[in-house]
């Protein structure tokens, strides 16, 4: 999408975000910008509001009445034409230790994704704060983690040739990851330990990274032995700010790089009001601004060259100022977020993928190997039998009343009856999928159940211990940090979670998701469905609708099928018709 003409931008906002075609800012040349244009899109935001949903011609083909599977092949072909695989990791500016760890411990990842290429180059070369919008499973978190670990080993290399500079840990926490939940923090921990297995000693890991929790032991460890990379969650950091914990001054005064994962949950842009009704846990509205102000207050502006060089981070992060270099990553970032961040980042702000919001190869449709289904479940009167039927597809035109309904969540009248219907539906689909996997020579390993926020996953697992399907028993397990397993060898497990617990997670053993539809938020569905299809993997997501127990007054006045199809349409999804080959359906 093209930027708006410069004439409609006021001077104050225009200087905040550099236009990629311009080479001067306030009369000063920025020659380093020419070196970054290939991997980071630095452009001006569009200052408009209330834009309707835009569907280009490639998107519209998926909604035409005469749409066929041949159209899928065309979409896939054009996707590959526009966004091929990124370069191999050894072609990117990563430290050799990181490349060795990738080839040894992540052998399944041969090539980077186009988005990883942009993130790694921007972090390692430009030193510019930037905001990223990329499809789910595009490797945003993994690419950022590789870059920060590479910075650590570059610091060690510097110290080897400059022993007078001192140890890296003496300068405190240099990089801070902020994530929405403990599960995503555990995933970062798993990635780091797996990547560095056989490369660093186990004792050295505590100097490289630590997870900040609210326990006294964790706070003391951060205070006295700060790591190079800190990882914490929105709630934990928010609690530290409210309680004015002494540790805040310790690491904000040394912080050089701040990476906010799933940043749309903390940026109070205009889309936040729409997400307030979604099942995700949002951070406090002033959380981000409070933390940035804290960094401004505590960060040492006049850092001597020995300390900065000793960490080796100044060579990567050119921008030395009153706030650290900041990176914001999410599949739901928008230009409103760019406008908000421009209040604090007043020199240069890069954007990656923001202009591609409505491009079909930059969203959920970028993973054509993931199939979406919409199934209505109903209990027959006076019996316990459940009937499953496909909801027929139709193109839904834009309608303001449906738009408002689509942004409101709804709940159920009888949660116990709803769970009984849902618990009967899941094993029946599993039975069909197990038969198909044998015929197609695919292994059906693990699945995930996503319940509305009013349902408790622990209660579900206690009530339904598991599902017997054929000669296999699928054990129900909550998605807690104690039970998380990022191995690809896990089998016969049903992970049960709420939407707020799965943000950003990549569990490679999961191939199917069973989602009990409870919200019309396109943002929420995008992140639920995004748990599949990472790095080109295949998968299926089954959306179950149980309309007999909806209690929303708005929903009773409106065709629920059209509302749900409208929300799927907003994220570029056309559900397929599922083939029920079981006679009981």
Swiss-Prot record:
Protein name, per record: Mitochondrial translation ATP-dependent RNA helicase mrh5
Catalytic activity: ATP + H2O = ADP + phosphate + H(+)
Record EC number: 3.6.4.13
A Pfam family per the record: DEAD
Motif window: DEAD box: 261-264
Described purpose of this protein according to its UniProt entry: Translation activation factor that as part of the MRH5C complex specifically recruits cox1 mRNA to the mitochondrial ribosome for translation initiation.
Cited SUPFAM superfamilies: P-loop containing nucleoside triphosphate hydrolases
Lineage: Eukaryota, Fungi, Dikarya, Ascomycota, Taphrinomycotina
Consequence when changing residue 262 to A: Abolishes its assembly into the MRH5C complex and impairs interaction with the mitochondrial small ribosomal subunit. Decreases cox1 mRNA level and the protein level of several mtDNA-encoded products
Motif annotated as Q motif, chain positions: 87-117
Alphabetical GO biological process terms: mitochondrial translation; mitochondrial translational initiation
């Amino acid at each position: 999408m093209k930027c708006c003409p410069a004439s409609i931008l006021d001077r104050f906002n225009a200087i905040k975000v550099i236009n990629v075609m311009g080479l001067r800012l306030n009369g000063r040349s920025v020659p380093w910008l020419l070196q970054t244009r290939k991997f980071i899109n630095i452009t001006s935001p569009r200052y408009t509001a209330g834009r309707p949903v835009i569907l280009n011609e490639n998107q519209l083909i998926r909604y035409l009445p005469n749409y066929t599977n041949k159209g899928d092949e065309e979409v896939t072909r054009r996707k590959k034409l526009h966004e091929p695989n990124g370069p191999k990791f050894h072609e990117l500016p990563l430290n050799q230790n990181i490349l060795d760890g990738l080839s040894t411990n992540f052998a399944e990842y041969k090539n980077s994704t186009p988005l990883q290429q942009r993130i790694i180059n921007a972090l390692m070369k430009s030193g510019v704060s930037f905001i990223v919008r990329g499809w789910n499973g595009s490797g945003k978190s993994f690419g950022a983690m590789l870059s920060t670990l590479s910075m650590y080993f570059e610091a060690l290399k510097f110290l080897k040739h400059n022993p007078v500079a001192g140890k890296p840990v003496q300068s405190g926490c240099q990089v801070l990851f902020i994530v929405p939940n403990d599960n995503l923090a555990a995933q970062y921990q798993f990635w780091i330990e797996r990547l560095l297995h056989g490369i660093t000693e186990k004792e050295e890991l505590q100097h490289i990274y630590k997870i900040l929790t609210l326990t006294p032991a964790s706070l003391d460890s951060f205070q006295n032995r700060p790591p190079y990379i800190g990882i914490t969650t929105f709630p934990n950091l928010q609690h530290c700010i409210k309680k004015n914990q002494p540790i805040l001054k310790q690491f904000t005064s040394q912080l050089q790089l701040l990476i906010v994962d799933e940043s749309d949950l903390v940026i109070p842009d205009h889309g936040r009001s729409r997400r307030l009704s979604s099942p995700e846990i949002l951070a406090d509205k002033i959380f981000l601004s409070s933390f940035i102000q804290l960094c401004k207050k505590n960060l040492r502006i006049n850092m001597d060259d020995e300390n900065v060089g000793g960490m080796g981070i100044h060579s990567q992060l050119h921008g030395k100022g009153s706030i650290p270099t900041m990176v914001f990553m999410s599949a739901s970032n928008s230009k409103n977020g760019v406008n908000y961040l421009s209040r604090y980042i007043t020199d240069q702000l890069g954007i990656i993928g923001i202009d591609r919001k409505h491009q079909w190869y930059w969203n959920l449709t970028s993973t054509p190997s993931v199939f979406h289904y919409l199934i209505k479940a109903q209990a027959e009167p006076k019996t316990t039998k459940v009937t499953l039927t496909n909801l027929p597809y139709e193109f839904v035109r834009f309608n303001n009343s449906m738009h408002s309904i689509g942004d409101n969540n709804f709940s159920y009248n009888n949660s116990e009856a709803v769970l009984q219907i849902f618990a009967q539906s899941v094993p029946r689909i599993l039975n069909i999928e197990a038969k198909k996997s044998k015929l197609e020579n695919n292994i059906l390993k693990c699945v995930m159940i996503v319940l509305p926020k009013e349902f408790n996953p622990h209660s579900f697992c206690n009530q339904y211990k598991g599902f017997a399907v054929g000669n296999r028993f699928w054990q129900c397990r909550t998605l807690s940090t104690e039970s998380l397993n990022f191995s690809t060898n896990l089998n016969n497990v049903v992970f049960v979670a709420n939407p707020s617990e799965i943000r950003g997670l990549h569990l490679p053993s999961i191939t199917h998701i069973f989602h009990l539809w409870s919200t019309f938020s396109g943002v929420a569905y995008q992140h639920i469905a995004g748990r599949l299809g990472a790095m080109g993997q295949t998968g299926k997501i089954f959306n179950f609708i149980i309309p007999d127990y909806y209690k929303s007054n708005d929903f009773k006045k409106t065709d629920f099928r059209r509302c749900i199809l409208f929300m799927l349409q907003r994220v570029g999804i056309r559900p397929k018709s599922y083939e029920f080959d079981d006679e009981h359906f």
